[in-house]
């Protein structure tokens, strides 16, 4: 789509964009923040346009897009299922297409895009986590869909997770960055997570908590992304 990166004079600037907790398929009708699949698409379009504008304004070499789980509303809560506008199969198909279209739009406008996905709790196949295997997660289907659709786009790299499917590992300009959903981690006790790695972790990016915040934990900067669905 965009081969300009091959002849590009580097600016030594990279950018990270976080997406999490889309909860595609759920419908809420509260007056402050109504949400359904149409609103989701509008929000995604707004985010992608703002990302492109900021990247171009700052002459960014490479965009790292970290998709931090809960792309779909899923099956895990029966009350949530009753609020869903689409069945879970439709959720997977439609959010996969939405993410694909968003990545293509980024690729058309930016030199290079790196995409990583981490699976969350809403995308597990079984409602009860005790009955669910780690690898039985709808995010694997979303990732496979993206892999097939993006295969011939030369300036997009879809990452394979080194540790497991729940953790994205990046090295950005010498900084070690990990991204994950966060359902198994408490914000006030991230030491165990940090100690899992045999290197210094400079940044941890999380979803799950639905409220954006940023703080430091043992010299590691922790960035918690807000909830895409706004609930």
What function would you assign to each model-found segment?
Residues 60, 152-157:
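Short glycine-aromatic motifs
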